[in-house]
Regions:
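Conserved alpha-helical substructure of the radical SAM core
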Residues: 1-89, 190, 324
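Flexible mid-to-C-terminal extensions adjoining Fe-S/redox cofactors in radical SAM and related proteins
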Residues: 217, 221-224, 246-327
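Short histidine/acidic/glycine/proline-rich micro-motifs that form metal-
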Residues: 45, 73, 135-137, 250
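Radical SAM enzyme [4Fe-4S]-AdoMet core and its adjacent flexible, acidic
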Residues: 83, 88, 93-229, 235-243, ...
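Short glycine-enriched, charge-decorated loop/helix-capping segments at active-site entrances
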Residues: 8-17, 104-110, 174, 298-299
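Residue-level signal for the nucleotide or nucleotide-sugar donor/cofactor binding architecture
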Residues: 18, 49, 110, 138-141, ...
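Residue-level signal for well-ordered alpha-helical positions
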Residues: 2-5, 105, 255, 295
Length: 327
């Protein structure tokens, strides 16, 4: 995880990283059960000294592999590996567009030059690159230039504007994210930049029907999860715990202890029982809200809680879309 730095002594009571063999064994078991597409992520997956061995082994199992990376560690060894066994996709997180931005947010000014060089190298090899960018108060001023970088290099760019509260943080730790009004406006702006004014106008033209629904559904139970999590998607963390999604802390199964199939069956069963906030069922903004079990859990500590911050984000998103449609 990006925000965790522990000594081996601090990590011992919590869990341990799984070995090369363990990862390859669980990968083999997952392939037998039908796994075809795999994402390797972290933190930074290339920090593991055995990354190349794990990646090669999984690739040779026939998996289509994507990678999430900050783009700093694609040195000669990794380049040689990718030349022979290119990933299906690599998502690079771009934190800014200058040495100053990387110095301020990441503490490593020179990382910016490394990241740009590696992005250009990946493109030169015909490897599909997507740009991600996590926007915080520290790099908000870089957002326009990140879009411009993506346009110049003909790269898809997806900004992460909603920041999950890090539920595993210390209670004393500060949590820095944009206010709901700013996030809502930025999501609308991203929709405009990515899809054009016609899409905005089409979305707004449908608001009338949705808003005719009376708020408050009167139900005691909310809707079930509607995403792929726990249906055709799972996540295994650094210590070997399986969840339905990387942003969920529960339910948890232990595939390295009970076997992959048993763990998957457990996740499917428990995920199917999750219900969301009843107030969301007939909310007038349901069609544009990105509410999910991970959001409600992180924001409220329960799956059926009402995430007021996300409600405010969506209201501001809605209002900004209307303004953009009139321009």
């Amino acid at each position: 995880m990006c925000y965790v730095r522990m000594t081996p002594e601090e990590m011992a009571p919590i869990g341990r990283e799984r070995t090369t063999k363990e990862w390859l064994d669980i990968g083999r078991d997952a392939v037998k059960e039908g796994l075809a597409f795999l994402l390797l992520t972290g933190g930074e997956p290339m920090l593991r000294p055995d990354f190349a061995e794990i990646y090669l082994g999984l690739t040779q199992m026939g998996l289509s592999i994507s990678i999430n990376s900050n783009g700093c560690l694609i040195g000669e060894k990794i380049r040689a590996l990718f030349r022979q066994y290119p990933p299906a996709l690599i998502n690079i997180t771009l934190y800014g567009t200058s040495r100053e931005s990387y110095g301020g947010l990441c503490g490593v000014p020179g990382a910016y030059d490394q990241v740009v060089d590696n992005i250009l190298w990946l493109k030169s090899q015909g490897i599909t690159v997507n740009l991600n960018s996590t926007i915080t108060p520290s790099n908000l001023n870089d957002l326009e230039s990140i879009y411009e970088f993506a346009r110049q290099h003909n790269l898809p760019m997806r900004p992460t504007l909603y920041a999950f509260p890090p539920v595993r943080r210390s209670n004393k730790a500060e949590f820095s994210r944009l206010d709901a009004e700013t996030v809502g406006k930025l999501i609308a702006k991203d929709m405009l930049l990515q899809n054009g004014p016609e899409t905005i106008q089409d979305m707004v033209s449908k608001f009338g029907t949705a808003e005719a629904v009376s708020p408050g559904c009167g139900m005691e139970q909310g809707e079930r999860m509607a995403c792929f999590a726990g249906r055709s998607q799972f996540w295994i963390s650094w210590d070997g715990s399986m969840t339905a999604c990387g942003m969920l802390c529960e339910p948890i199964a232990k595939p390295f202890e009970i076997g992959f199939r048993a763990a998957w069956d457990e996740i499917v069963k428990k995920t199917a029982a999750i219900t969301l906030c009843p107030d969301c069922t007939d909310c007038q903004h349901k069609g544009i809200c990105t509410i999910c079990a991970a959001v409600t859990s992180a924001e409220t500590g329960r799956f059926d809680g009402k995430p007021e911050y996300m409600c405010a984000v969506t209201q501001n998103y809605h209002d900004e879309l209307i303004k953009l449609a009139k321009q």
